UniProtKB/Swiss-Prot annotation:
Residues under site feature: Transition state stabilizer: 18
Protein known as: 3-dehydroquinate dehydratase
Keyword Lyase: yes
Gene: aroQ
UniProt catalytic activity: 3-dehydroquinate = 3-dehydroshikimate + H2O
EC number(s) given by UniProt: 4.2.1.10
Coiled coil: none
Length: 148
């Protein structure tokens, strides 16, 4: 069975409550349940983890290399400045897809740049929570050798 890690960064524990006009009304618990069910339809075991702490996310990325076939990662605001997360991603062979619920390129100027994107396998932005589903499918394609 293929195993993926879903990482959500700072403030994503506030999904459904924080700026629903931008991030929607789906809570993190609802999203994780939906994605776990969706992944299982493709014989993918999905493990979900959220932290507001950079170091905890780095530890999960390092650990993932020996445990998971791919990572779906919404780094939240760390996207724009965390060189530590960038280095963690660059240090592993496991493919990472960066996901953002909103279109970071159409928001405030400070959100336009991702320091992580150059070391990820891809980036999905602006498609709401559906972006996570697309990331699961894209990663599955990559690990099965179809997306190379």
């Amino acid at each position: 069975m293929v195993r993926f890690l879903l990482l959500n960064g700072p403030n994503l524990n506030r999904l459904g409550m924080r700026e629903p006009h931008i991030y929607g009304h789906t809570t993190l618990a609802q999203l994780e349940k939906q994605l776990t069910e969706f992944a299982s339809e493709y014989a993918v075991e999905l493990t979900c983890y959220q932290s507001n702490y950079e170091g905890a996310l780095i530890d999960q990325i390092h650990r993932a290399e020996s445990l998971y076939d791919g990572i779906i990662f919404n780094p939240g605001a760390f996207t724009h400045y965390s060189y530590a997360l960038r280095d963690a991603i660059a240090s592993i062979q496991t493919p990472v897809i960066e996901v953002h619920i909103s279109n970071i390129h159409a928001r405030e100027p400070f959100r336009h740049q991702s320091v992580l994107a150059p070391v990820t396998a891809g980036q999905i932005v602006g498609l709401g929570v559906n972006g996570y589903r697309l990331a699961i499918l894209a990663l599955l394609d990559m690990v099965e050798g179809k997306g190379k």
